[in-house]
Amino acid sequence: MRIIQTTGKRKTAIARAVIREGKGRVRINGKPVEIIEPEIARFTILEPLILAGEEIWNSVDIDVKVEGGGFMGQAEAARMAIARALVEWTGDMSLKEKFMKYDRTMLVGDPRRTEPHKPNRSTKGPRAKRQKSYR
C-alpha cells in the first residue's frame, strides 16, 4: 500500500496531508470535507480535487491536519498540501502544469507575511504616525 505525506503553508497556517489508496474520502482534522464551514473555505480546499478529476479523486483517501492561522489561511494551506500530494501520487507533469496555470500558489508558497507593529504606536499598526498639530 502506497502512502504519501506532503505539507502546505499559508501565512501562519501549516497543513500536513496523507494520501493513500481509497474511495475518495477527504477529511480535514478528522471531519469530512462536506461539513467544513464557511462554504468559501470548503470550495478552496476542493479546488485541486475538482481540477484533477473524478477518476483520481475517487481512487484516493486524503487526511489533512491543519493548525495555526485563521480559517482561510488554513483552507489555503490544506489546498496546497492536497495539490502537492495529488501531483506526487500521479507523477503526472500535465496535472502539475494544470495546477500552475490555474493558480501558482497551489504548489508554490506565498512569501508575504504581516508586518510587525513598530514601537510607540503598537495598537494603530506598523506605519501609523502620531497626529501633528500646528496650533
Swiss-Prot record:
GO CC, alphabetical? cytosolic small ribosomal subunit
Species classification: Archaea, Methanobacteriati, Methanobacteriota, Thermococci, Thermococcales
Q: Name one GO biological process term.
A: maturation of SSU-rRNA from tricistronic rRNA transcript (SSU-rRNA, 5.8S rRNA, LSU-rRNA)
What InterPro entries does its record include?
Ribosomal_Su5_D2-typ_SF (IPR020568), Ribosomal_uS9 (IPR000754), Ribosomal_uS9_archaeal (IPR019958), Ribosomal_uS9_CS (IPR020574), Ribsml_uS5_D2-typ_fold_subgr (IPR014721)
The record ties this protein, via PROSITE patterns, to: RIBOSOMAL_S9 (PS00360)
Q: How does it assemble?
A: Part of the 30S ribosomal subunit.
Q: Which terms in the Gene Ontology molecular function aspect does this entry carry? A: RNA binding; structural constituent of ribosome
Task: Note down the stretches annotated as region Disordered.
Answer: 107-135
Cite the entry's keywords alphabetically.
Answer: Ribonucleoprotein, Ribosomal protein
Q: What is this protein called?
A: Small ribosomal subunit protein uS9
Tell whether Ribonucleoprotein is among the UniProt keywords. Answer: yes
Biased composition, class Basic residues, residue ranges: 119-135
Query: Which Pfam family, an example, fits this chain?
Result: Ribosomal_S9
What does the sequence similarity comment in the record state about its family? Answer: Belongs to the universal ribosomal protein uS9 family.
Instruction: Check the record and name the HAMAP family matching this protein.
Output: Ribosomal_uS9_A
Ranges of compositional bias, category Basic and acidic residues:
107-118
